[in-house]
From Swiss-Prot:
The keyword Lipid metabolism does not apply. Part of the 50S ribosomal subunit. Forms a cluster with proteins L3 and L19. In the 70S ribosome, L14 and L19 interact and together make contacts with the 16S rRNA in bridges B5 and B8. Keywords: Ribonucleoprotein, Ribosomal protein, RNA-binding, rRNA-binding. One of its GO terms (cellular component) is cytosolic large ribosomal subunit. PANTHER family: 50S/60S RIBOSOMAL PROTEIN L14/L23, LARGE RIBOSOMAL SUBUNIT PROTEIN UL14M. This is Large ribosomal subunit protein uL14. CDD domains: Ribosomal_uL14 (cd00337). The keyword Nucleus does not apply.
Length: 122
């Protein structure tokens, strides 16, 4: 459950290490983002010579949350931290590698690239 001012780890090699959610996209009254939702983020910590710089604003898709996701069979997939993957203007990932597991809920048409790059799909 990600809301404004939430800090997330970055699960790709775009150069950002930590981002902060500044808006949950999808309507003016939308408060929380879950796995698979697109949020607007600002880069709070980045490595030198990376593709992104501190202070820049990007779209990102949430790939892991502490809250987790409930499956139709009743099981709950939950993670140790919140993580996101940065997206460009065409909603494609900026990085070329994904770190850590992602969930099957990302298997929509929009995020198949992220699922194919991920080392593990839960």
């Amino acid at each position: 459950m990600i809301q404004m001012q939430s800090y997330l780890d970055v699960a790709d090699n775009s150069g950002a290490k930590e981002v902060m959610c500044i808006k949950v996209l999808g309507g003016s009254k939308r408060r929380y983002a879950h796995i698979g939702d697109i949020i607007k983020v600002t880069v709070k910590d980045a490595i030198p010579r990376g593709k992104v710089k501190k202070g820049e604003v990007y779209d990102a898709v949430v790939v892991r949350t502490r809250k987790g996701v409930r499956r139709p069979d009743g099981s709950l997939i939950r993670f140790d931290g919140n993580a996101a993957v940065l997206l460009n203007n065409k909603q494609e990932p900026i990085g070329t590698r994904i770190f850590g597991p992602v969930t099957r809920e990302l298997r929509s048409e929009k995020f198949m690239k992220i699922v194919s790059l991920a080392p593990e799909v839960l």
